[in-house]
Amino acid sequence: TVPPTLVAFGVTTADSRKVLSPEFKAAGENIYYIPGQALAQEIDFDLIKSNFAKFEAIQADHKVTAASAVKYGGVVEALALATFGNHIGATVTLENLETALTAQLGGFVFTSPEDIAGVAKIGQTAADFTLTVNGVTLDGHKLDSAFQGKLEEVYPTEFAQATELEEVP
């Protein structure tokens, strides 16, 4: 059975060479963070526009290999999701751990093999599939299982395959 599903599409024009996916691509790359506004009743559109302009300028001047907007799970969620795709880990130090799981508007986490001035470098990607935040190490396989496990009942990825072919009239 298929659960009730809403499918929506957004269309825009963009140079496909500048479109980035969120997953980390290689070990040893620098991880950068542009903090956004904590989710609040009032939206600081000037900060959000400034962050987008800053990220666009960085992307124009430097090699950016992966990027993700910080969403409802905060910067730690963005980092965890970035490790899942290619099972590349990360070691980061966050100054404000109290708000690391707070939803944000207009924040970005991105990676680059280059040193980039004027933006907060929070860590590096790592070959081992772990996420280390301020010295606390989380196993990437356990994080990924916990993340995917909550969706397994709705969108199963494992099922018993029928061994007999049904007759088609």
Regions found by a protein language model. Name each.
Residues T1-T102, P113-P169:
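Intein/HINT protein-splicing elements and their conserved insertion hotspots or analogous self-processing inserts
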Residues Q104-G106:
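A structural-propensity feature for long, helix-poor, extended segments
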Residues V109-T111:
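Carbohydrate-binding surface patches
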